[in-house]
Amino acid sequence: MVLMKTPICNFGEKAIDFNLPGTDGKQWSLDDCVGEKGTLLMFICNHCPYVKSIQTRLIDDVLKLMDIGINSVAIMSNDPDDYPEDSFENMQKVAAEYNFPFPYLIDESQEIAKAYGAICTPDFFGYNAALELQYRGRLDDSGMKPPSNNSKHDLLEAMIDVANTGNGPKHQIPSMGCSIKWKNSA
């Protein structure tokens, strides 16, 4: 497991369209996922201990964001041939087990992860209503540990600002996680 950190937010960068299959059997595009006040696009997977440790907290925050007009979508771009736990069938199981309140999509070609510049799981891209990037940071300050009563909810707070003002915070702390497992181009 290689620990990676996300780069700084490239404020204003436009979201890139996609057309990917979801664990629900539907094809999803960016337009299908857009929220009235913003959109949270997340690169996650099933096997990464960083993602596993935040799963419940992430869902809690996504539900709060839905209440204020921000929709979320998760994309899995790892190579399932090398990481079978990230197979589409296992994605379906995880989505059902946690009752994901967002589409969980597979990027089998890895083209979408490359287009977005995603580097790790989790990697969060928070967009305003105009689909301009405003947040590229961590979920919270707990990392892989259980949150304390005074934990800072970076993602939630940033996306509330995005919903209210269209702008994310200037100071953002990178997300940390496992590197995306790229296919060998042999």
Positions of the model-derived regions?
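Chalcogenol-based redox active-site neighborhoods
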Residues: M1-N164, G168-Q172, S179, A186
